[in-house]
């Protein structure tokens, strides 16, 4: 049987890519009151470090290798110019009747030469290769998104592999523990060839169109 999502999902959603600080985000609460707009969901697009896509921008922390998960208390936001207290922000949003949804994309990102190296992202990429958490070419090498596409050079997680799901969502569980209400599953149209293989034995021929479903299904289960 079909299961309906919670009622708040059916209310008005608000989002803007330039809401990239706690100050700007909390400003929306006042604007909603001022204009009496009955939003139920606020989506943050530019909230993360733009590398791991699961850590608030500006957070300080001790990097973790081998796919180890993070906990709420692992992060220090006191010096962040972007999100000095995301826990407090989430509580304010909830008090205002807003549910927080965070933007996601299914990549182990290949950072550009003009970007500051994110060492946690490097560790995650190494772990994905070492434990075969990503999709592979038929010769066994990691598949990388081709040039000319979004996130070129990035590897993509293989959600048919239980270990991938365990590690990927283990990294994001602390966000739910903070009170985050959901995730916007952007992207996913990254399988650009038939010549790739998945953990479950399928190839790109079956999964070019099926991969976005695997991606959203994994998040729904999470």
Q: Where is each model-derived feature located?
A:
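Catalytic-domain carbohydrate-binding cleft regions of carbohydrate-active enzymes
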Residues: 1-222
